[in-house]
Every structure is written in structure tokens, then in C-alpha cells.
Amino acid sequence: MSQSKKPSESTEVMPISGLLETLGFSNPSLRCAVRKIIETAGYTNPRKTNIAVDKAKFVQIYIKTNFRLVCSEECDAASGKKRTKSSLRVRADKCEFCNGSDQNRLVAKMAKNLSDRGLSEILIIGGSTQSANTLNRLLKSCKINLKIIEGTKRTNLKMAKLLCRNADLVVIWGATQLDHTVSKVFNIAAEPGTKVPVARPGLKALANAVNIHLRSD
């Protein structure tokens, strides 16, 4: 009876430079630095230019497990839940925080601007449930406390003043689900220096308005 042959390991290879490009390391100097990281980890050595495809999968897992892959200082700060890891700069489309999204990058910039100024209590009036959920998800790792008031829920002036008193910024999000009576009472209640009017819907508009306000503050 003939013995069954042991399946041979895959001999397919790929360029190491191509692997690093796939992970988002387009900058040559950074690619060189990451190459040294995987050499130290024992996945390759300085003499080799290619790597087995099977081994490349383990390299990807190693890099993603041990490092934060972010495209900017802002996205690095916003991905605060993984602060125990060192960060590596990658292309925006491979960024763990923004995934190449202009909206998410603006939110990350907003989060860093708020943090740099020691502002953490943010009151938002209006907006959709979907926008609120997205904003909470993006900022869940930041030291920012969001309180979102439904734009269709009536609030008396006394309560509005109490809410505004405890807020570092009061964002009044126009062109969303925001009744005129609700926006009016919060416009009265908020201190001028804390009030941020947003004229358009969408998180990009909100983040941009907050960033402009903080820049001119």
C-alpha cells in the first residue's frame, strides 16, 4: 500500500516591498524602518527581497496586532484606546481610524483640537440619530463627553441654561432635525463664547465648524 504524500508547503512568493506597500507603507524611509521591525521579529533577513505568501499573512497579523496604523497625528490621538501600542504612519486608506474618510479625519482633528484646549464637555443640539451614533463611535476612545439633545424635543429655558452651563461648547446644528423653538431657547441659553452654529447637515460640516471656532478662539 502506497503511503499518502504529505502536502507540500506553498512555494509562492511576493516582494517584501510589495507586502509593505499593501499594508500602507508607501513612504520609502518608513518602509525601510518597518522592514527592520519584521527582520527583528524573525520573519525575514536583510539578504532577502521576497517572502513566502504564507509567511506574509503572519507578518500582516504581527504588524496589525503590535502597532497602531494611523495616517496622521490627529488620527493617532483619536484612536486612544490602543495607547499601549506604538504607532506607525500609513497611507490614509489603511488608517485604522479614518480609513481614508475625509469626514473621519475632520472628526479626528476636532477631537485633537478639543483635547489640546482642555475641552471635554460638548453639548450638541439637533442632528440625526445616525449622526449621533457615528460620532459616539468615532470618539469612544477619546476623553470627550458628548451630550446630544434631540432637535424635536422641547426644552425649557431653565433646563437649557443648566445644560449649557455644564458644557465647554454648545453646538447648534442647523439644517438637521432641529425645531426653531428648540434652537431659539439654546441660542438664548448658551454663552456667546461657547456657541458654535452649524449651518449644514453632515458630520463634516459639524467638525469643520468646531475646528474653525477653536481656531478663531
Model-predicted regions and their roles:
Residues 1-65, 71, 75:
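Long terminal accessory regions outside catalytic cores
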